[in-house]
Amino acid sequence: MALTIFPSINALLNGLTAILLLIGYYFILHGKRVLHKKIMLSAFTTSIVFLCSYLYYHAHVGSVPFKGTGIIRPIYFTILISHTILAVVIVPMAIVTLVRGLSSRFDKHRKLARLTLPVWLYVSVTGVVVYMMLYHF
C-alpha cells in the first residue's frame, strides 16, 4: 500500500470515530446501555487503529509542512496546536473512562465521560479539519 493513502485513511478513521461517539452518546441518552457499550468500544477501537496508522505514516514520512498563506495560516496553526494538545490529553482520559465503564463503576464513568466526550469529539473532528486544510487547500 502506498504511503500517500494514509492521510485519507486517517481522516476517514477520525470521522468514523466522531460518528460512533455521537451514536454512542445517543444510545446512552435513550437508556440503551448494551448498544452504547458496543458502539463506544467500536469508537475506541477505531481510535486505536487511527493511532497505529498515524504513527506508522509519520514514522516513514515525517512531518508535512503546511503550504497555506495569509489569514488561513494562523487559523490552521491554532487548530493544529489545540488539536495536538488535546490529542495527547484524550488518550488517558478515554482509557480511564473505558475502564470505569467496563468495571461497572458507572458514577465515576459518567462523571469523567462528560468531560471525555467533548474532548474526544473535538480531537476527532479537528483531525479531519487539519487533514482537509493540509492536503486539500
Regions found by a protein language model. Give the residues of each.
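Alpha-helical membrane insertion/targeting regions
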Residues: 1-137
